[in-house]
Amino acid sequence: MTKEYDNVLIVQTFSKSRSMAGMRIGYAMGNPELIKAMNDVRFSYNSYPMTRLSVALGVAAIEDEDYFQATKNQIIETREWTKRELKALGFTFGDSKTNFIFAKHSTVDAEVIFDKLREKHIFVRHFSGERIRNYLRI
């Protein structure tokens, strides 16, 4: 896709799929000119430069394909189970391959659900934008 479209950038974080949240490790793939432009300004938006330790850990994570596949499969299984449970509770959502579910309940306002969940120390995101007002990011 990056060869077909010069304005497409594919980014990957190691936070969830490689269990390295907080390490600030990831990469971007895209048109060489787009990557160069990002490199030219990277210190203005990236306040977490990669250390030698971060690079070594990132390389080790990439080389451990078995762990990555097991973690990825567990994330997918958990997401699909959660979608089934949410659907049974009256939620609707689009098909997504992300690590979150953007859901709307058929009869209960999202803000009400958000407040009730927060009271139980369950944290989801609620949005107030016009087109996504009644959705939760779970």
Per-region residue spans from a language model:
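Short, conserved loop/helix-junction motifs that constitute active-site signature segments
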Residues: M1-Y5
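Short acidic capping loops at alpha-helix termini that bridge into adjacent secondary structure
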Residues: D6-N7, N134
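PLP-dependent aminotransferase class I/II
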Residues: N7-L86, F91-G94
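Short, acidic/turn-prone active-site loops that include or flank metal/cofactor-
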Residues: S15, S128-E130
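Residue-level "edge-of-site" marker
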Residues: T51, N99, E130
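Conserved PLP-binding catalytic core of the aspartate aminotransferase-like
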Residues: I75-I76, E80, E85-K120, L136
